[in-house]
């Protein structure tokens, strides 16, 4: 969901001052909704594989995507039978101000 508020654009509760980044965040939010609809959280190994693939492919560029990856990672680290070393860290993209 995106809304314009003076000079900022709100996407999923985050205020973006850059319109290009806001549009990217909106695309990522739509992608997240699609992925979430397909992802079966009852199969952690599958979640891990998809999570790692998203990280390796640098699928997300905005805080919206980073937060989604963080949520998935937080879930994965709670699964005792997963090898914690296989769970990649969430990459943080440096943004130009």
What are these regions (language model features)?
Residues 1-97:
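Intrinsically disordered, low-complexity linkers and terminal regions
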């Amino acid at each position: 969901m995106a809304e314009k508020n003076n000079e900022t654009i709100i996407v999923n509760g985050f205020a973006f001052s850059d319109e290009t980044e806001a549009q990217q965040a909106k695309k990522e939010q739509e992608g997240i909704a699609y992925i979430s609809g397909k992802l079966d959280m009852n199969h952690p190994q599958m979640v891990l594989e998809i999570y790692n693939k998203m990280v390796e492919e640098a699928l997300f560029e905005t805080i919206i995507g980073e937060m989604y990856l963080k949520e998935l990672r937080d879930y994965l680290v709670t699964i005792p039978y997963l090898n914690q070393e296989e769970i990649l860290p969430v990459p943080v993209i440096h943004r130009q101000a």
